């Protein structure tokens, strides 16, 4: 599999930025809006946006159950920000009717870093990614409050991060990866390259 076909859930969020990042990282990338399109892809990116709105759109576009089924069957997936929330098995501070995919055994707190004005950037050490620390952009971002035994913690907010110091902001379980931050907006392709490598290896 030289250039795997990776879909980007194209309902909301930084779709174009993820498509560009995937193309730069050695994948052929395509927007996904219909259930039948899920069958053709080797991996899926779930972009940021507003998680409760995205969960409604998944139901409206009849993607929720087909996507859950593909994830159960081992489809590699990567979620950033709201995508992380949707991939979680448990979500705190969300609407009672919000749907999620349950692909990673973790508890996530929505908007944990605060409102838009509380958005910030930080340099992170990221497990499995070599080179300089990764510049991470957090926009009304979640953090992870609990992970299951099979979940690998990939990054935490550094000690210089104030009240958020030590909080988990990147995880992996099997072929599913999630980050609180938005690597698609910085030009640093290393998270997307890691995910494309995971897709190739499945």
Curated annotation (Swiss-Prot):
Keywords (A to Z) from UniProt: Glutamine amidotransferase, Hydrolase, Lyase, Pyridoxal phosphate
Pfam families per UniProt: SNO
One GO cellular component, as annotated: glutaminase complex
Gene3D superfamilies: 3.40.50.880
Gene Ontology process terms (BP): glutamine catabolic process; pyridoxal phosphate biosynthetic process; pyridoxine metabolic process
Catalytic activity: aldehydo-D-ribose 5-phosphate + D-glyceraldehyde 3-phosphate + L-glutamine = pyridoxal 5'-phosphate + L-glutamate + phosphate + 3 H2O + H(+); L-glutamine + H2O = L-glutamate + NH4(+)
EC number: 4.3.3.6, 3.5.1.2
Pathway where it operates: Cofactor biosynthesis; pyridoxal 5'-phosphate biosynthesis
Entry annotation: catalytic residues: 81 (nucleophile), 182 (charge relay system), 184 (charge relay system)
GO molecular function: glutaminase activity; pyridoxal 5'-phosphate synthase (glutamine hydrolysing) activity
InterPro entries: Class_I_gatase-like, PdxT/SNO, PdxT/SNO_CS
Claim: Plastid is one of the keywords in the record: no
Residues noted as binding L-glutamine in the record, renumbered to the chain: 49-51, 110, 139-140
Coiled-coil residues: none
Subunit description: In the presence of PdxS, forms a dodecamer of heterodimers. Only shows activity in the heterodimer.
Family under the similarity heading: Belongs to the glutaminase PdxT/SNO family.
Role of this protein: Catalyzes the hydrolysis of glutamine to glutamate and ammonia as part of the biosynthesis of pyridoxal 5'-phosphate. The resulting ammonia molecule is channeled to the active site of PdxS.
Protein name: Pyridoxal 5'-phosphate synthase subunit PdxT
UniProt organism field: Rhodococcus jostii (strain RHA1)
Lineage: Bacteria, Bacillati, Actinomycetota, Actinomycetes, Mycobacteriales
């Amino acid at each position: 599999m030289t250039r795997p076909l990776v879909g980007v859930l194209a309902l909301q969020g930084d779709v174009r930025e993820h498509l560009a990042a995937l193309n730069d990282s050695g994948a052929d990338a395509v927007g996904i809006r219909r259930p039948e399109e899920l069958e053709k892809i080797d991996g899926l990116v779930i972009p940021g946006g507003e998680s409760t709105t995205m969960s409604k759109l998944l139901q409206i576009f009849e993607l929720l159950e087909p996507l859950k089924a593909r994830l159960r069957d081992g489809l590699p997936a990567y979620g950033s920000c709201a995508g992380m929330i949707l991939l979680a098995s448990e979500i705190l501070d969300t609407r009672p009717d919000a749907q999620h995919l349950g692909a990673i055994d973790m508890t996530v707190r929505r908007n944990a870093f605060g409102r838009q004005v509380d958005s910030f950037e930080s340099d992170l050490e990221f497990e499995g990614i070599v080179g300089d620390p990764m510049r991470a952009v957090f926009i009304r971002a979640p953090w992870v409050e609990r992970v299951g035994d099979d979940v690998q913690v990939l990054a935490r907010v550094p000690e210089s991060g104030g009240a958020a110091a030590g909080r988990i902001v990147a995880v992996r379980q099997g072929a599913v990866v999630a980050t609180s931050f938005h690597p698609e907006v910085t030009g640093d392709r290393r998270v997307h390259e890691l995910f494309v490598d995971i897709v190739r290896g499945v």
